Amino acid sequence: MTLKMFFTIIAVLALVHGIGFVILPEQVAASYGMATSASTVLIARLFGAALLGLGLIFWLARNGSSEFVRGVFIATIIGNTVGLIVVVMGTTAGTLNSMGWVAALIYLFGAAGSGYFVMAQSPQLTSR
């Protein structure tokens, strides 16, 4: 997989989920087995806004400088690893239904893919 393809995939995942959380927070939260209240709707929309920002960063990183791309990868490794831990804890505790495992796979893909490009593809970052 190329660096550009990886960024395209994670950008689309973030943007689609972000739009869903902003526009349809009750439905998206319900699909993850979460009860909705005014508070959860607000947090879901804030999460969606953050995902929209991340999606745009990933999209722009497709053509970014190697220093910018490396920084995005490092931030993605950290953020997605923390997200993975949180979603696994929530799913195993029963706070999220089995859709939590889908979110876990998305976080794992982002962290592992970013780690791959940082560790194994450092020359590609400079010669893109």
Tell me the role of every PLM-derived stretch.
Residues 1-13:
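Cytosolic juxtamembrane helix and N-cap/initiation of the first transmembrane helix
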Residues 2-3, 67-69, 95-98:
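Membrane-helix interface segments
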Residues 12, 16-22, 40-63, 74-85, ...:
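Core segments of alpha-helical transmembrane spans in multipass integral membrane proteins
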Residues 22, 59, 88, 112-118:
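Membrane-embedded alpha-helical segments of multi-pass transporters/permeases
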Residues 26-38, 90-96:
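Membrane-interface helix termini and inter-helical loops of multi-pass transporters
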Residues 57-69, 91-92:
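Juxtamembrane helix-break-helix junctions at the cytosolic face
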Residues 63, 85-102, 119:
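Membrane-helix boundary connector in multi-pass membrane proteins
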Residues 109-128:
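Membrane-water interface at the C-terminal end of transmembrane alpha helices
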